[in-house]
Structure formats: structure tokens, C-alpha cells
């Protein structure tokens, strides 16, 4: 009797369906593919290879290639259907003849609408032959609901054009989608639309496919990083995910990848195995396909395209395609290794007992400690995949709990990095060493701390795991990685287990450096309370205060300053924490640092002070706050190593209001002008600065296009007398920036000739500001801008800016 291999619908770790006989298959077909339950057998055709059935007035002939009994039209039935009106015996003879002529058909539509009451289908009306029906199978959930409905109603439902029908993704579409997914896991709308047009799909279906594919990647293909800069040590060794996580079906006696693989192992148990097998690489060589899967006959004819298995069956003859290449070589070897293929078979609960039959003297028995070319063992794979029962049975069968792969990873590292706590406990109970590290120096405790697995870390520490072991790449300890990842409870656990809070890595960074970089206030507070060095200097000269000031973590900055951190330590570039805060325009951080006595006169290695940095990277408000702070002794004309003054940098950057403010602080335009001319800067800027130097107070008839504002006498008249003209009002707003350089006297301006002794002249303000936009925001202060627009202006008295 023919044997049909049912496709396993369970993945690794679940019971296998196994082989189903002819009678079992008929009952299966009756339950799932005949929802009306009116199945009859024709006793007059027992000599046929396949059973002939009358299903709701339809002659059926089951074929294993059609699991769901698709309905196919057969014109030969029409030759004898008219005889059904005579008597029941003639009808049976006609049906027998038709079934003998069409033995390979599955379900044939009966075109007779005039059957008498003696016919088997006296309660059903049939559709015409022109209505070709291909109903889809009904699930077991809807089986009970369909019992009370007629076949005709079910057929009409299938032909309903308004009913939504699922459209399967073709292998070609899957191939292209998978290729795009490997490059773009989150394609944008434009790319999804292009894919929809290219693949003849809807944009919504493409979006749903990528969502499902990302979910599959998260659940089944997650590749954990064991250390910073380390490769995917574990999963690269495991090989292809398709080979590890899928168990396809197969037709015939040899089986396919997975489902048929069980037949392969059964053949081994029954003694039908090759006597030339290698005991260290089980069933290697050319015989592996015959024993592990493929089509019928043990040769292997199953082609695994993603999750689709296609078995070739023509006229009830299995055509097997024998791939005589070992899985460890060629294209198959690139997808998954020999060990991974054996793992998915031998780790099945039904076959795990086979492992205890290992006999060193028997070349055909299996060595539980054998490894493939990548160093993979059964115990390592079981620990990685989370199979607790298999791990226990393997250890009981003599598997080494400390066995390593080619990268030095142990089963305990694999279980720790993925958070398989029961397996970690099981391995530790069987004397797995918690201090064994891989080739990069990663320990199980480091892996657990990186993944945030608190219970696993606690179990490892209870079994005397080394708390201060460092990695070989960057010398980090578990406390470093826990501080960087923000796992406060793990940090507390490590410190309670005598981990040093001031331990340094290969870059001289402490866990406090990591906490300050990432902004974890609670971890920083925990480390400081347990004696962390707040002035520790890393390889670049940075202290934790440098990093918190750079990142703008004000709470941590204040915490460090209140606990005695030094704000005046310079790094390798000469920067103090306040230099970084000014460069990143962190105004609140600068306030904290000034409050805790940060020195404002310190220069960087290239000679720049805080005003230089304010002009280049920050706003006018930052420069004002620094100039007006107590203890600021920065000169307005102070230059860096290249001879650049703040005024030169402000003019070059086009920061008009910064130029005005620096001039009000006594910055020399002559120095800036000489530098601009020397470097051949913008002619307009040079012309403006040059005109302010050479123009006298009596030059009211100048024809220069730039000098279009009244001289200093007219400006003083505008300030003292109201003017209703709109143009004069604009001049009034602009001239509110007129600064009086008399000794503390803000009521009366000095004569123009005495205001600037050599090189300064007031027309510069008007010319530059005249060319700027009237509503231009000149600082981050809202009140500053409001007063500027209202015409009240800003007056500067003896170097103090007053709103």
C-alpha cells in the first residue's frame, strides 16, 4: 500500500507527524477536504490504484500531489451522464467507466442537472460544466459551520467576485523582495511603490511583507554582538537561518529537508545506513543527501525555495534528482554546515535518545562531542537555541559542557548572551566554567551584562564568576558595559560583588566616563557614591566633566561640580569643560561652570579663548555672558596663534551684531582690517572697514554707495530730537547702537574727533546695520530682540550692556 509523507507543520522541538497510510489519508481527506461529509466509496472499482470516490455527485480520484482535492472538469463524464436518467444501475456503470478512463483526475464536475431520485446526489443541484470551480480548502476552525450548508452554496461563495481571495507571493517575487530586504530592512515609501509596480503587487502588500520579514528577523535571525567591534561569532558559525530553523516536507521515501530528514534518521536506526560513514562528521560525503532528505527513493528530489518544497511526480512515478554533493561543500555548504543539518534532526525530542547509543568502537555511532568544520557541536547549538531538554540529555550522554567552537565560544556564553536562564542554570549545575572566555576575551558574565540579563548575571556571580575580567579588544569590564548600556540594577549588583567603580579600560576610561557620555544620572550617582574618581583622565585627557559638558547633561554636570570635580582640567587639545560647553552653545551648562569658578581666561592649544569660540560656534548672548562675568579678563583684541581676533572672525562670518558688540568693548577695527586685506577677503567687508578708518567727521559729501548714513553730528541730533519720518525712524532704530565712550557719562556724547582716537568711527555701525534686515534676530534673547524692534535700543555704558 502506498505510503504518503505528510508535510510537518511543526518546527524543531515539536512532535513529528510521521508516515500516514492510505486509509489514514482518506480519513484526513474526508475531514478537511469534504466539508459536507457526504463521502462514498464505489465498490465496483476496487482494482484501481487510487480509490475512486463519489463526492457530492462528483467522481473523485485522490492524488498525493493535490492535498486539497481541487476540482477539475472532465468532458468524458458527459458521454455517460445521460444514462443516469434511466436507472441507478446504468448510472453506476457510467460512473465506473468514467473513473477508469480518468484515473488521474481528482474531482470531476458532473454536468447532469436532471438526475432522478435514485441518483446518489438527489438532494443537490449541479452547476453547468462551463462553470469551472476551484474551491480552496477550508480550515478546521470553519469545518463545523459548513456542515449545514449545501455544496452549491459553498461553490457560489467561491465564485463571489466581492469575496477577498488571498494571493500567494510567487518564488520570483520572494527572491527579489528578499534581495531588497538584505540591503534595506526599512524601505521608504518611494522604494515600496517601485517594488509594487515591479512585482505587480499593491504597495500595502509590499509593506506588510517587509513588516513580517522584520518580525521574522527579530525572532529567528537575531545576530547578537558579543563585544564592541566583535563579529557575529555565534551565528556566523551556525550558518544559514533557513537551515537551522525550518523543517520542510518531502515526498517519497527519502524525505525532504526536515520532515524527510526524520525518515533519514529512521533509516539509520533501522540499520539502512551507509557503512562508510565518518564517526566524527556523521553521514558526511555523498551519502548525506540520501539519509537526510530529498525526494523519494532516498536520492533527494526536494528543492527548498524559501519555505516552498516542490516534489516532482509525473504519472505516479517519482523523478528523483540526486545531488551527489556533501552539505559541507559547494552551494549547500555555504547555506548550512553538516553540524547544523544534523542538529535540526538529532535535537528533535523523538530522536534525542538516539544519542545515548554512542559507542567509540562503532564507526557509525555519533560522537556527542564531535564538531564540524566551524567548530559547532550539538551541545553548543542546543544551548544557543534554548533547548533545555536536549541540553540535559546531551550532558547526561557525556557532552562536554565547556566545549568551544572555532572562535572560543562556550555553550555558557551562547546561553548568556541570549538570556536562556534555565540552560545557564543547567550548565552551571554540571560544572560549566563561568570564567572561560572566547578569543576576544568575552566572558559569560560580560555577555549577560551587555544583554541586561540580571538573573543570569546573579547566577554567574553566585558560581564565582570573575567580576573584573577584561576583554582583549578594549579592556572593558562587565561594569563598563553595564554603565554604557544603562543597566542600573546590574551595576549595583556588580558593585555589591566588589567591582571597582574606578576601574579603567585600555583607553583609561572608567565606568563613570560611560555614564556621563550617555547621560545616565542614576548610574553616575551610584558610581560617585561608591568612590568613582571624578577627575579620572582618559587617553584624550577628558574627565567625566568634559564628557557631560560636551553632551549637555546638566544634571550630571551639576552633580559632578557639587561633589568636587575640577572644572579647570585641560585635555590634550587644551580644552576645559567650559570650552566644550561654549563650543556646543550649552548656555545652562556654561552658567553652572561659571558659578563653580571655572577660569575664563584659559586658552586652547591653538591660542583661542572663549570669545573666539563664542564668535565661531555660539550666539551673541554667549559672548555677552562671558564678557560680563566676574573674573573675565579677556581682551577684545586678543588674537590666537594665527593672529585672528574675535572682531576679525565676526566680520569674516558676517555676524553684524557681534561686530557691533565687540567694537563697543574696544576691539580695534584696524587690526581686523589689516588681516582682511592681507588674506584678500571680501572686498565689501574690506571697503566698509576701510571707510570707517579713513573717513573724517566732516566728510558729509561722500559719494560712496556704502556710506549712505549721516555723519556723527546728524546721528547725535537724531538721538536728541524726535523724528516722525519713516526713514528717520529707521535711522533712529539703527542709531540706537550708538555707544558713548565718555568716562561714565551717558548723557552727553564726546565730540566726534575725540570718540575714537585713531581708527574707530561711528558710521561703521550704521552702514553695516543698514544693510542687514530690520527684523533679523541677533541673539537668542527674546527680550533683547523685542527691545530692538520697539526702538528703545541698547545702550552701552563703560563696557556694560544694559537692556
UniProtKB/Swiss-Prot annotation:
One of its GO terms (biological process) is response to imidacloprid. Residues 23-41, 125-138 have a biased composition (Polar residues). The keyword Amino-acid biosynthesis does not apply. Its main location: nucleus. Keywords: ANK repeat, Developmental protein, DNA-binding, Homeobox, Nucleus, Repeat, Transcription, Transcription regulation. 'Wariai' means 'proportioning' or 'ratio' in Japanese. ANK repeats lie at residues 374-403, 407-436, 440-469, 474-503, 507-536, 540-569, 573-602, 606-636, 642-671. It comes from Dictyostelium discoideum (Social amoeba). This is Homeobox protein Wariai. Putative transcription factor, that seems to be involved in anterior-posterior patterning of the slug, probably by controlling the proportions of prestalk and prespore cells. Residues 23-144, 288-330, 695-760 are annotated as: Disordered. Residues 291-302 have a biased composition (Gly residues). InterPro entries: Ankyrin_rpt, Ankyrin_rpt-contain_sf, HD, Homeobox_CS, Homeodomain-like_sf. The lineage of its organism: Eukaryota, Amoebozoa, Evosea, Eumycetozoa, Dictyostelia. Residues 42-124, 696-746 have a biased composition (Low complexity). It is found in: Nucleus. Residues 303-322 have a biased composition (Basic residues). It holds the Pfam family Ank_2. Residues 162-221 bind DNA.
